[in-house]
A protein has these predicted regions:
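Beta1/beta-strand and adjacent pyrophosphate-binding region of the FAD-binding site
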Residues: 3-17
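Core beta-strand elements of the Rossmann-like FAD/NAD(P) dinucleotide-binding domain
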Residues: 5-7, 149-158, 229-230
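Glycine-rich FAD pyrophosphate-binding loop
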Residues: 10, 26-50
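Short hydrophobic core segments
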Residues: 10-12, 35, 134, 153-170, ...
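An anion/pyrophosphate-binding glycine-rich loop and adjacent beta-alpha core
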Residues: 39-41, 46-47, 55, 59-62, ...
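Glycine-rich active-site loop/strand segments that organize a redox cofactor
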Residues: 50-97
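A glycine-rich dinucleotide-binding beta-alpha-beta segment and adjacent secondary-structure elements
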Residues: 130, 302-382
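A conserved short coil-to-beta-strand element within the FAD-binding core of flavoproteins
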Residues: 130-143
């Protein structure tokens, strides 16, 4: 069954990118349909930012992403879109910005974002076809035929794929569409969970579960070389390290690497050592368990003392210089070996990998199939935590549609 005789544009995937593409196409007068595999568009938007929808970040730069796309292309996308608040104000949604540059809907409710997007889709007359799981794309009489699992067919002059990656599988992004694109001759770079916890087999994590600590966090390779660093709050789970700073390192983490926490980054090694020696004199008549009181959470302090082989019941005055030096080192380099990333896709916020940037041109169009474009997470690009990935979703979708329209005009 054919839903309509012909569309200027078929958008595959009704998430953040798909809805933005639909709005941009509708505003430019294109006859457009959004094809969504779930029973409703935009479901994943509701889960972003813990339900508050961190929709952008004022500090976004090219340095905040990992990608195989040409850097000039990414820069053009960001420059073309500009400030996300302007786009959302055009939808009737006002925003607020926190001290870190993270942009949220003023209501701090993700539903407001989705409602604004869908209201504009409706106003523009853009069709939304749900429960349409695309299983094949082929050419018929020079046009694209998009085929659903149940045999329905949509004919379109152009296609934008906004089907997402593999993260958030309960919300429609299970990576299935990469198989469709592979059959069309496209390459997919290795797919890995990103913005997710990092697993460790440290025997102490179970005792640390539920605690948080502020630290400078570094990811080290097998030669102890720093791969990347972040600063922020680390959350301890039963077998994982979590928190935004950990999420931002996860895409680079591999089994056998080391996560190093500097628990006192504002102090030099010498300053930490002098401070501990001062505390030893100050608390010489008490036990080691109390040595780090005033510096660290008690449970964290106990674990670190144990790792330094300092019995908690040992008199502080009896702690040796060697043990104090080891403790100093541990406070600046508390290590956890990576056993694996928390590899279930359900625990990741975005996907590392996707359609290779070498197979998309400067307009986010396929270099293999004329009329096929990509936007959002389907492309091999992932951004750090804090609204950056959603910014890319909006920006790349708008850019891809504008590029199609530009080429239609022959510019």
């Amino acid at each position: 069954m054919t839903l309509n005789n012909y569309y200027d544009l078929a958008i595959i995937g009704g998430g953040a990118s798909g809805l933005t593409a639909g709005i941009t196409a509708g505003r430019s007068g294109m006859n457009t349909v959004i094809l969504e595999r779930l029973s409703r568009t935009g479901k994943k938007i509701l889960a972003t930012g813990n339900g508050r929808c961190n929709l952008s970040n004022n500090n976004i730069t090219l340095a905040d992403c990992e990608t195989s796309l040409n850097s000039e292309t990414v820069s053009k996308v960001l420059e073309s879109f500009g400030n996300a608040e302007h786009f959302f104000r055009s939808l009737g949604l006002i925003c607020r910005t926190d001290e870190s540059g993270r942009i949220y809907p003023y209501s701090l409710n993700a539903t407001a974002v989705l409602d604004a997007l869908r209201l504009e889709i409706s106003r523009l007359g853009v069709e939304e076809t749900v429960d349409f799981k695309v299983t094949a794309i082929r050419k018929e009489n020079g046009k694209f035929a998009v085929i659903s699992e149940d045999g329905r067919k949509v004919i379109a002059e152009n296609i934008i794929v906004t089907a997402g990656g593999c993260s958030g599988q309960s919300m429609g992004t299970d990576g299935q569409f990469f198989d469709v694109l592979r059959k069309l001759g496209h390459s997919v770079t290795p797919l890995k969970p990103a913005l997710c916890p990092i697993k460790s087999n440290s025997p102490f994590l179970k005792s640390l579960k539920g605690l948080r600590v502020h630290a400078n966090v570094s990811l080290l390779d097998s030669e102890k070389k720093i791969i990347a660093s972040e600063n922020g709050e680390v959350q301890f789970g039963e077998d994982v390290l979590s928190g935004i700073c950990i999420f931002n390192l996860a895409s680079k983490a591999e089994k056998g690497m080391i996560v190093s926490l500097n628990l006192m980054p504002e102090y030099s090694v010498q300053q930490v050592n002098r401070l501990i020696r001062h505390f030893q004199k100050l608390r010489s008549d008490t036990v080691a368990e109390n040595l780090l009181t005033g510096i660290l959470n008690k449970r964290i302090a106990q674990i670190i003392l144990k790792e330094c082989d300092i019995p908690l019941s040992k008199n502080v005055s009896e702690i040796s210089v060697k043990q104090l030096n080891l403790l100093t080192e541990k406070l600046g380099n508390w290590t956890f070996e990576v056993s694996d990333k928390a590899a279930e896709w359900k625990n990741s916020q975005v996907t590392k990998g996707g359609i290779s940037g070498t197979e998309t041109d400067e307009f986010l169009q396929s270099t293999k199939i004329k009329g096929l474009s990509f936007a959002g997470e389907i492309i091999d690009i992932n951004w750090k935590c804090g609204g950056y990935n959603l910014h890319w979703a909006w920006a790349s979708a708008q850019y891809a549609v504008k590029s199609i329209k530009k080429h239609q005009k022959g510019d």
